[in-house]
Amino acid sequence: MTESTFKSGFVAIIGRPNVGKSTLLNRIVGEKIAIMSDKAQTTRNKIQGIYTTDDAQVVFIDTPGVHKPQNSLGDFMVKSAFSALHEADAIWFVVDASMARGRGDDFIIDRLQEVKNTPIYLLINKVDLLAPNDLLDVIASYQNDAPEWAEVFPISATEGDNVPELLDNIVSHLDEGPQYFDADQLTDHPERFVIGELIREKVLQLTRQEVPHSVAVVIDKIARENEEKIHIQASIIVERPTQKNIIIGKQGAMIKDIGTRARKDIERLLGDKVFLETWVKVEPRWRDRPQALQTLGYRQEDY
């Protein structure tokens, strides 16, 4: 292989909340870089996952699920999602095969129809939950009042069904280009960001109601104490004292469970033993305060 035959490009992944975008990205790169949860709006930043082979590199942008904004953070998330469309060489629009086409899908489709000269793929995800005879009806429901799809792929991000074929297809359509990142690099986000997201994932998995959406995580310190252990200090940010009490739990049981689960994932990520300390802090209405959003890493100029 010569450098002139190397292919590369950027692919934006967009869709409603909870259709499996982050699961698909993690399936492709083979590591957990985007957090997953049954809560809507899990992804808040555009996560760039990097897939590299001997002759190609695809940089994937996993956008926040598009929803009606309820606060400044929500507005940031939606703007972040649509800005990715203008950066991409191709777009993957992911829908949930187990759910009927809805207003959220139509809202995204309207924006996709404004995109010119960029191939748009329709990915029908979660086909493992669908009766085989129903697949054609699902595909047909996305043919009217929609862009002309470059390709339609039924997939299961969870099981991996048809994902290798999808990757082969997108690589075949890329133009020749440079290798933007080292072959062993899986994301362009710094280590602190990914660690913080792994902690936030555990909060999302273990709490309910308004608590998951009110949480941010700040990594205060990462220090290697010796050759075998990494010391991490993290602050879990909430908006109200009642939320702080929920996350701490009775006699500290909840915060201990969050820390234990997060530590295991962080150790797998870093390949070393981790000593994780977590604190819970109250920042009133941080989701509606632009300065607080910037401090916590949601910076519009980055997107």
From Swiss-Prot:
GO terms for molecular function: GTP binding; GTPase activity; ribosomal small subunit binding; small ribosomal subunit rRNA binding. GTP binds at residues 15-22, 62-66, 125-128. Residues 155-157 are annotated as: G5. Residues 41-45 are annotated as: G2. Residues 207-284 form the KH type-2 domain. Its main location: cytoplasm. CDD domains: Era (cd04163), KH-II_Era (cd22534). Signal peptide: none annotated. It is a peripheral membrane protein. Residues 125-128 are annotated as: G4. The keyword Methyltransferase does not apply. Residues 15-22 are annotated as: G1. Monomer. NCBIfam families: era (TIGR00436), PRK00089.1 (NF000908), small_GTP (TIGR00231). An essential GTPase that binds both GDP and GTP, with rapid nucleotide exchange. Plays a role in 16S rRNA processing and 30S ribosomal subunit biogenesis and possibly also in cell cycle regulation and energy metabolism. This is GTPase Era. It comes from Leuconostoc mesenteroides subsp. mesenteroides (strain ATCC 8293 / DSM 20343 / BCRC 11652 / CCM 1803 / JCM 6124 / NCDO 523 / NBRC 100496 / NCIMB 8023 / NCTC 12954 / NRRL B-1118 / 37Y). The gene is era.
